[in-house]
Every structure is written in C-alpha cells, then in structure tokens.
Amino acid sequence: MILTLAYFMLGTLLLGVFAEDTVSQIGINDSLWYPYDEALVLKPLPNNDLLLSFAFQLQSEPFDPAVSSMSYDAYEHYTTFPRAIPPLLESTATRQFHLRFTRGFWDALSWGQLPHAGKEAGASGVELWSQVQAMDQEQAFHNWKKLSNSLSGLFCSSLNFIDESRTTFPRRSYASDIGAPLFNSTEKLYLMRASLPNEPICTENLTPFIKLLPTRGKSGLTSLLDGHKLFDSLWNSISLDIATICSEDEDALCHYEMDARIEMVTHVPSALARGERPIPKPLDGNTLRCDTDKPFDSYQCFPLPEPSQTHFKLSQLFARPINNGNLFANRPTRICAEVDRSTWTAFLSVDDTIFSTHDNCFDLSNDQNEGGSGYDFILESTDTTKVTPIVPVPIHVSRSLTGNGQDRGGMRIVFHNDNDTPVKLIYFESLPWFMRVYLSSLQITSTTSPQLQENDIILDKYYLQAADRKRPGHLEFTMLIPANTDIVMTYQFDKALLQFAEYPPDANHGFEIDAAVITVLSLESSSSLYEMRTSTLLLSLSTPDFSMPYNVIILTSTIMGLIFGMLYNLMVKRMVTVEEADKITLQSGLKYKLLKLKEKFLGKKKTKTD
C-alpha cells in the first residue's frame, strides 16, 4: 500500500514537471489558435447619428459528407463553432440558411446605402430563407418546417408559425453569392423563403445569438452587446448566415462557415443624455438649445441645429468598456473608424494610455491591457457635419395601399430613379392568401415619360396565384427603370373573409403585409449589386363584432332566468285569494308566533298560580 502510494506521488510529480515544461514551451505562434474573427466598425452619419457594425466569423472543423454522423466510425469535434448548428443542418438536409431580425426604419435619404450593399439586412420583423436538399418539393417543405421549428426554439422566436401559407419558392430573388453543394446527385436544392413582419424583436432573440459565439458575452466585442442599448437605437439588425463550403480537392472535405452580424444606428446626443439623466426631467434654462436671435419673451423655443462638436467614448454608449480581446482566435479583435480625417479623430484608451493609428484601426492585444481595466474607444470631432461620403441608393421605392372599402383594395408602388443610367431590378412580393390579386388590373404609368408602355418596363413576369390557406401569392417581376424617371405600378385585389378562429387577438389593429424585396442587378452580367426592402404595410379586413357572442350569452341567460323563475313559482307555490293570503300571513308571521308563544307562557304561569 505504501509502495503504491509512493509510485503515485512520484508519477504525479513527474507529470506536473512535464506539464509545466510543456506549458512554458507554448508560444503565441503555436497552433492552438482557432478560426474566429471579430471586428467592430464605427461610421459617423449625418445629424449626429452613428452606425456600429459588429461582425463575427466562425468556421467548423472539416467533415466528410459521405460519412453519416450515425455511422460507427463517425466522430464530431467542435472548437469555436456552435455545437447546436451542425446536427440541425444535417437532420434537415440544409446546405445554407439566412436568418434576419430587423427593427426600425433605415433613412436612405440621410444615411445612403445599407451596410454590405443591403445583403446582411432583412425586412422589418423576422425573415428566413434557406436552400434545402430533397427528392421533391414535399420532402423539401417537410425539412423546411423542421428547420423553422428548430430555429424557433433556438432563438426564442415565433418561427414555428411559418407554414405553407407563408412559404414561397423564389425564382431569381435571394440568389446566394456562394454556391451550395449537392451531396446526392439524385436530389435537388430547393430555395424557400418566409417572413413574419409583425414579430417583435427583443432581448430574448439577442441572448441566444450571443450564446452561439465562443466568447458568450464575457470577453471581446460581445461584452458590449446589451439588449437595452441595442434595441434603444433608431435601427438595428441581427443577421446569421451559415453556409456549407466544400473543397475541390480529392479528399472532398466540407466545412461550415458562420457569419454573424449586428448592425445598429444610434443618435449619439440622445444616447449620451440617457446616460447622464436616466430618469427624464426638465432641463435647466442654460442647457436649452435655443436661437438667441429670437425675442426672449417668445412663447416658443426655437431649437438650433445639432451640435457640430462632439467627444464621446464607446463606454458611454454601452455603459461598459470592452472586456479584453478574445484569447483563442488566430486574429486579434479589431476596431476601425470610418471617419473624415480632416475633422474626426479616433483613439484607443488602455489603462489611461491613449493610442492612435494612421488608418484609425486598432488591434486589441491582451498584452497591452495588463491592468485589466478593459479597452475604450474614443471619437471626437470639431465638425460633425463632415462625414465620409454618403453613397446614394441606386433607386428609391415606396409602396402603399389604396382604397377605403372592406371588400377590395389596391397596391401602389412608386419607383424613382434619379440616376443618369437605367436601373435593372427584380421586384419580389409575397402576399397573403386573403389578398386575391387581379393581375389583369396591373397598370404601369409614368409622370416623366408618358410614352412608356408596360412591355418597356417589365422584362419578365412571374405570378403564382395564392391558394386559400395553402399558398401565398408570389409576384416576381424583372424590371428596367429608365434614367431620371418615375414609374408607378398599380394593381387591384379583393379581400377574402377569414374564419372566426383565424383572426388574431388584435384583429382591429390590422394584418401585417410582408415587405417587398428589390434586388438591383448589373446591366452587363445581371449579378446582384444591391438589395433593399420596402416598409411593411397594415391591411384592414372586415372584422366581426367579437363582443356579439358575449351579448347573446348575457341576453339568453337573462331570459332563461326570468322564464325559469316564473315556472318555478307556478310549480312550488299555491294560488290563493288576497283575503286568504292576508289570513295566512297573520297566522304564519313572526309576530303571530311571538303572540302564541307569549299566550302559551302566560297560560302555564296562570295554571301554576291556581
């Protein structure tokens, strides 16, 4: 026993010495880093707005698509890639999917184009599209439904409400820049898309998103992400893109790539004011921004334009600094500022030390943050009106409902091209089944070029009629908008009646209509250049009086109570005259019983006295 214990202690000591020597030999250039990149880009916008773009890129370990995870020789190894994603992709035969959570309004006139040419943003609410491998469309929809249900539980959203009445199969829209592999040559890839325009976006969707990242909100850029700050912005978008990439080598190994992004636009003075005054209260007179040229006794305060000078820290916007960089990635955390260098200056603050670079990009090295106080990013400007050039959108599109009846209505779409060159685009629209569109009522007019005809504008037309409760209306046009021209497209539709159980709890509020998707194409190669969405619409349908059943129940109960009372009285009571009733009352009342009791008592007392 003593000898065994001695051998054990000696082995432990040797193992500790070997481990200590091994750890001391591990350097920063060793092969223990993992494929994970994170970056933050800050871009000042006009009117003291600020665009913040968080980007996270991950890559899974290689795998052989010919080996199933259920086989005896299969193994799975995870590093930084989330473990919940690969089984989901394999069980649903999904080769790639794209998920968007978007809230707010993007001001294209002031802010220009969307980040990343609009390909990382979605429509208001929740939007999902994916490529699924299957034998036929029925099997593809089964896998699609399974995918949406799984993502619903993973991100705490209402994606489980996606059914066949909300799903469309785009023909030319939503084309991916990355080709999806086909693991079985006898099957095909099906592209499916669905949207929930009335889905509220909240912290319950952000928290699972952060948990997919390896830092999990504890370090790196994810330590900045807070639901209160993110959803208190003017516009925000959470995007998740996962694709299957296969090599063309002989081994034919594949891997998954995950691109997660968070974009937000915040108004800097408002964000700073919330930090200074968490509880709203009136401002002092000396802090009001008023025009002193106006009469001092005027009843109205004339606000001045936005302040042209600013100085703020990233910790003031998010109420916390960056908690170190990532400790395991093959590249350090990176922060960049896209600013006009003539009036803007960017600094990195580390342990009360300020750094600057020529390109306003900073790598967060953990060797610099020895004090452990975290990193802070500082932006200051002497003239906030000077920002980097705003790239205008290639085309402006607005959509609205027409008509005021409860049985029919119309749609009006305006395309405004203020460029000197024509714009080629794909107009995609998914309409609910209760909007019965009359394609024969489609009209194309132009206020600037009245001679234009429908064939001059619409190059290709695809329309799939909706089926009641089974399929939405699918409208997809390839259009060419001439230069410096306004095009108005209108069509009419009927409003179908819904069943009683199909109305939502807030039926009088209206029904949300999906946003239209516009994909701007290149005139030479027809490749996608820019993507944008219109705003969602609110359609009013004939709504029944839901209080009527309750009124009927109350009225019926009252009448039945009256009838039952009358019948009950006739059954248990006897009909007598008034005189007999008075006599019975005198002989059955409480006063009569007291008199009888008194007489009885006095009679007994008199008998005893005698």
Curated annotation (Swiss-Prot):
Give compartment(s).
Answer: Endoplasmic reticulum membrane
Q: What are the record's GO terms for cellular component?
A: endoplasmic reticulum; endoplasmic reticulum membrane; GPI-anchor transamidase complex
Q: Which residues are glycosylated?
A: 184
Q: Report TM segments.
A: 552-572
Recount the PTM note.
Answer: The disulfide bond between GPI8 and GPI16 is important for normal enzyme activity.
What residue stretch is flagged as signal peptide? 1-19
Look up the domain of life of the source.
Answer: Eukaryota
Please give the InterPro entries that the UniProt record associates with this protein: PIG-T (IPR007245)
Q: Which residues point to the Cytoplasmic side?
A: 573-610
Q: Alphabetically list the UniProt keywords.
A: Disulfide bond, Endoplasmic reticulum, Glycoprotein, GPI-anchor biosynthesis, Membrane, Signal, Transmembrane, Transmembrane helix
Q: Which GO terms describe its biological process?
A: attachment of GPI anchor to protein; fungal-type cell wall organization; GPI anchor biosynthetic process
Which pathway or pathways does this protein act in?
A: Glycolipid biosynthesis; glycosylphosphatidylinositol-anchor biosynthesis
What does the subunit comment say?
Forms a complex with CDC91, GPI17, GPI8 and GAA1.
Q: What else is known?
A: Present with 1680 molecules/cell in log phase SD medium.
- How is this protein named in the record? GPI transamidase component GPI16
Species per Swiss-Prot/TrEMBL record: Saccharomyces cerevisiae (strain ATCC 204508 / S288c) (Baker's yeast)
